[in-house]
Each structure stands twice: as structure tokens, then as C-alpha cells.
């Protein structure tokens, strides 16, 4: 603030300068703005506490990750004074859903590209961190390298990526899309999704409008229920809407369900099928959900039948819809058993039928 005895001319010039700046001008520390300062930081950036405390024997780290039920190992190559690393750690790993998803699927080990700790690589070769980074061609920071259960590199992400693309990269590896398609193709499959704006969920007319009173514990409903747990800026959600949910046959099946769409991170009130009053966020947390979109199917009495918590396409989604509509779970107990024995030939019953 200017002191009171500052000259009127100087104060006027200052006010003109302030007014000349557009109100919507992005902050200089916003990495997505033209004014972002990418010079080395003045203060070092720290990696999250949940990163693995490692002796940098990478094969041992991978073995431990797989033993814990994870997809593989994620190496984070960074520097202490790297502004792009700071942006990734704060903007991407600073988001609750990204952190939860990453921790569920990967152990993350940090490599300082200027460090001197000894690293034992997947082949047993021992080098210092700095040389290891050179050998791995991690010349730009941050660089993320993913290793799968065969101890081979399956994907790398170089530089900073906004949360939307970063989530997509994690999903691309965790769901093993690298086995069948390039990351470019995986991203392109979401281009047909309908967005009202960047911060909204996708919309379809088969969703019931709020308030969501889903209680089925006192009175049996006439139709099964499917709840879509989603989140904003969700690449996998966009893929679902651009693909399976734009298919006429899929939509015909879905319109025979009661269908509800929830933002799994919102405080929107909801009454669950069991009659519990809660919020979308609290319900998703109680269900242990970490992936979006997750589709949970309930029968007419409010009992969960099954859930889809990974990327799903036409064949599988339509199969699950038929499985629930035909009440195949009553006879076969599981979707896979139903699929093997009846799913290929069993049509969904007419609306209201109860086989």
C-alpha cells in the first residue's frame, strides 16, 4: 500500500496501471498462463510424504508393489528447484482423486536427476542417480516412467501435463491400454464427448433429475438402478460418453433402468438404496471408490448386484446391462459364469418381466 503522504500524481499513475490490467488476467504462477516464470525456483520443492521410502533397488521396489496388488512401479525424475516439477506435485498430485488413484495402482519412487544416491536398476546395474537419469534419457524434468509386472518400461510422460491429461496417463497404464493402442489414440477416443463447459459432468437424458431419493429398503422398486459415480475433467468419463453411451443399443438398455449421475467429490445430498441420508462424496468414500467413472448396479430391493470400476466399452457394458436386466445373478451368481453359459444367447427380458 502507498503511504498517505505519497504524491497525488504518483498515486494516480499507480491506479491507472492497476486499471490497465484486465480483471481476468491469469496469475504469474499459473503454469498454464503466458506469464508463468519457469526460471529455477528460489526454494526447493519437496516430494509428497506418500512417495515410497526406497533404497533405490528398483527390482525390489517393483516386487513389493506387485505383492501389494499394484500394477507396477512409477519412477518420478525431478529436481529440487524445478518449477515444472512443483507444478506437477501441486496441481496434479495435489488433487485428492489423483493421489488416491496413483497410490492404489502404483508405488512411486523419486529419482533426483542431480543426486548421487546409488540406484540398482531392473537389470542389477548400479549407478548414481544423475547417471541413471542420463542412461534413462530423462533429460527434462519432471519425467515419469512406468514399469509393469514384467519389469519393462511401458510408458513415459515427459514434462508437466494438466490434471485432465495426467489422469488419462495414469488410467492408460493402470488399465493396460498400452497393450493395444498408443496414448495418442487413447486420448483421441474422448474427443466426441459432449461438454457444456470444462467444469461440468457429461449429460444424458436418461438420468433422473435431483433430488435423488434412491431408498428401496422399504418398498421394492419397479426397475433396477444404476448409479454413475463420476468427476469433472475426467478423461475416462469422456471416453465412456463418446463411445458406449452414444450407442443406440446401449441407450435402449439403459432406459430400462433407473439411472442417476453423481459427482463423487460433491456434497450433493442423496438417499442411498439402503435408506441412508448422506452426500455423494460421503457415499463414494464409504463405498471405497477411487476411480471415475464407476457404475454400480442395484436390484429392485436395493441390493448391490455388481460394479464397473474401470474403462468399459460396448461389449462388456451391454453384457452387464443384460446380466442385470435378465437377473442372471440369481441363477449363475457371477457375471463371468453367466457370460460363459447364457450371456451370448440370452436376450434381456421385456420391461417388467421377472424370469
Region spans (language model):
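Active-site-proximal cofactor/substrate-binding loop regions of enzyme domains
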Residues: 102
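Proteins that catalyze or organize thiol-disulfide redox chemistry
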Residues: 27-73, 80-96, 113-117, 121-127, ...
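Intrinsic disorder/low-complexity signature
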Residues: 2, 26-27, 109
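Bacterial N-terminal signal peptides
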Residues: 12-22
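Bacterial N-terminal signal peptides that target proteins for export
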Residues: 2-11
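A fold-wide structural signal in alpha/beta-hydrolase
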Residues: 107-109, 258-260
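Alpha-helix initiation/capping motif
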Residues: 1-2, 19
Amino acid at each position: 500500500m502507498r503511504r498517505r503522504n505519497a504524491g497525488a500524481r504518483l498515486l494516480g499513475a499507480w491506479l491507472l496501471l492497476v486499471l490497465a490490467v484486465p480483471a481476468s488476467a491469469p496469475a504469474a504462477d499459473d503454469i498454464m498462463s503466458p506469464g508463468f516464470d519457469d526460471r529455477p525456483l528460489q526454494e526447493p520443492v519437496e516430494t509428497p510424504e506418500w512417495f515410497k521410502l526406497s533404497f533405490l533397488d528398483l527390482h525390489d521396489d517393483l516386487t513389493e508393489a506387485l505383492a501389494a496388488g499394484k500394477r507396477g512401479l512409477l519412477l518420478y525424475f525431478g529436481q529440487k528447484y524445478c518449477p515444472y516439477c512443483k507444478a506437477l506435485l501441486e496441481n496434479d498430485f495435489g488433487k485428492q482423486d489423483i493421489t488416491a488413484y496413483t497410490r492404489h495402482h502404483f508405488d512411486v519412487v523419486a529419482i533426483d536427476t542431480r543426486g548421487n544416491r546409488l540406484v540398482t536398476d531392473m537389470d542389477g546395474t548400479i549407478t548414481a542417480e544423475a547417471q541413471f537419469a542420463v542412461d534413462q534419457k530423462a533429460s527434462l524434468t519432471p519425467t515419469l516412467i512406468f514399469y509393469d509386472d514384467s519389469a519393462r518400461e511401458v510408458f513415459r510422460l515427459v514434462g508437466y501435463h494438466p490434471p485432465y491429461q495426467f489422469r488419462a496417463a495414469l488410467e492408460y497404464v493402470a488399465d493396460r491400454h498400452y497393450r493395444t493402442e498408443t496414448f495418442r489414440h487413447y486420448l483421441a477416443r474422448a474427443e466426441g464427448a459432449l461438454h457444456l463447459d470444462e467444469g461440468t459432468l457429461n449429460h444424458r437424458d436418461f438420468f433422473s433429475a435431483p433430488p435423488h431419493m434412491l431408498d428401496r429398503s422399504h418398498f421394492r422398486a419397479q426397475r433396477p438402478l444404476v448409479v454413475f459415480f463420476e468427476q469433472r475433467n475426467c478423461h475416462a468419463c469422456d471416453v465412456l460418453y463418446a463411445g458406449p453411451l452414444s450407442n443406440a443399443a446401449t441407450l435402449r438398455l439403459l432406459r430400462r433402468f433407473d439411472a442417476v449421475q453423481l459427482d463423487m467429490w460433491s456434497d450433493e445430498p442423496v438417499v442411498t438404496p439402503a435408506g441412508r441420508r448422506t452426500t455423494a462424496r460421503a457415499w463414494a468414500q464409504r463405498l471405497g471408490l477411487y476411480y471415475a467413472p464407476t457404475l454400480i448396479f442395484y436390484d429392485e430391493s436395493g441390493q448391490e448386484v455388481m460394479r464397473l470400476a474401470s474403462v468399459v466399452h460396448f461389449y462388456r457394458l451391454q453384457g452387464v446391462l443384460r446380466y442385470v436386466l435378465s437377473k442372471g445373478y440369481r441363477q449363475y451368481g457371477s457375471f463371468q459364469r453367466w457370460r460363459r453359459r447364457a450371456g451370448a444367447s440370452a436376450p434381456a427380458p421385456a420391461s417388467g418381466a421377472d424370469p
